[in-house]
């Protein structure tokens, strides 16, 4: 399994040492699969900043280049500007676009408010997980295992993804590695620490 995606503390492990000693009596060989085939090099390099922060092995992206990860400082409830960002992605004819929030309540609120502005968007929750294509809003936890053409993280601030909390960091990593082609990271206030330096260099002013 991928330790970086073990987002549930009550049923996850921090390393393989205990498993090797307790389940295999140290009689096994541990191999690491470090290739990433989903995302572009640019997205994976940014996501690796999160892994490095929590001391996990970083993934090696296959040689597929794309656009740089984009950072935009924006108020969490500035739905008109968020809609602008979604529409820019829609113009590229992507089949699947996801807005990923920290939890399900935030994801539903995002979907409801964007729908009021006329966006055709589906809210994905624990009781409503059907999704084929189009634009959707969901939590970081529910995004695990899914992939989209493009992803917008709705708020990657330190308040939402604490750099001192490994579960937050793993959820951030999961969210960042969902897109096939493009990743845009919005944040309100201070961006989470692992992404701070990169965001300061590459943020979008408008």
Language-model region placement:
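Conserved helicase motor core of SF1/SF2 NTP-dependent helicases
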Residues: 1-206
């Amino acid at each position: 399994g991928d330790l970086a995606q073990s987002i549930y503390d009550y049923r996850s492990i921090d390393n393989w040492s205990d498993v090797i000693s307790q389940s295999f009596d140290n009689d096994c060989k541990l191999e690491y699969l470090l290739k990433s085939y989903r995302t572009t090099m640019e997205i994976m390099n940014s996501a690796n900043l999160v892994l490095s922060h929590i001391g996990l092995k970083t993934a090696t992206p296959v040689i597929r280049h794309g656009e740089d990860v984009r950072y935009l400082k924006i108020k969490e409830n500035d739905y008109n500007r968020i809609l602008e960002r979604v529409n820019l992605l829609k113009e590229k004819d992507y089949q699947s676009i996801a807005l990923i929030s920290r939890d399900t309540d935030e994801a539903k609120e995002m979907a409801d408010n964007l729908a009021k502005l006329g966006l055709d968007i589906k809210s994905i929750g624990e009781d409503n997980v059907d999704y084929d294509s189009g634009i959707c809003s969901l939590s970081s936890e529910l995004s695990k295992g899914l992939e989209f053409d493009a992803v917008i993280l709705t708020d990657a601030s330190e308040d939402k993804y604490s750099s001192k909390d490994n579960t937050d960091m793993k959820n951030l990593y999961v969210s960042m590695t969902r897109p096939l082609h493009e990743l845009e990271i919005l944040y309100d206030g201070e961006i989470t620490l692992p992404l701070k330096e990169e965001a300061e260099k590459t943020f979008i002013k408008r």
